[in-house]
Amino acid sequence: MIPGEVIPKAGEIELNAGAPQVVLEVSNTGDRPIQVGSHYHFYETNGALSFDREKARGMRLDIAAGTAVRFEPGQAREVRLVPLSGARKVFGFQQKIMGDL
């Protein structure tokens, strides 16, 4: 082994295996691009994103950690969400929850 070397497991890795999923149509009604990171509480994203927010409560994007999805002005796309895991408490973001989900 070489210091810092990464040896990936053979085969494919399934993200969020077995997690319940919600698919939502999301559109950017604003005039600026909006980028949402992998672990951002989707319910609390920028108000210019139009979607069913109640279905997104307690959810995050079903994408690899450290990545993001970008919504260009006027763009609509489907996104797949999975539940936030762990203690199921949300603090910060836009301060709309500040506690238990």
Swiss-Prot record:
Gene Ontology cellular-component annotations: urease complex
Similarity comment: Belongs to the urease beta subunit family.
Keyword flag Hydrolase: yes
Gene Ontology MF terms in the entry: urease activity
InterPro entries recorded: Urease_beta-like, Urease_betasu_sf, Urease_subunit
Organism name: Chelativorans sp. (strain BNC1)
EC class: hydrolase
Pfam families tied to this protein: Urease_beta
Location(s), subcellular: Cytoplasm
Xref: HAMAP family: Urease_beta (MF_01954)
Assigned keywords, A-Z: Cytoplasm, Hydrolase
Pathway: Nitrogen metabolism; urea degradation; CO(2) and NH(3) from urea (urease route): step 1/1
UniProt main location, coarse: cytoplasm
NCBIfam families documented for this protein: PRK13203.1 (NF009682), urease_beta (TIGR00192)
EC number: 3.5.1.5
Protein origin, superkingdom: Bacteria
GO BP, one annotated term: urea catabolic process
Catalyses which reaction(s): urea + 2 H2O + H(+) = hydrogencarbonate + 2 NH4(+)
Subunit description: Heterotrimer of UreA (gamma), UreB (beta) and UreC (alpha) subunits. Three heterotrimers associate to form the active enzyme.
Name used for this protein in its record: Urease subunit beta
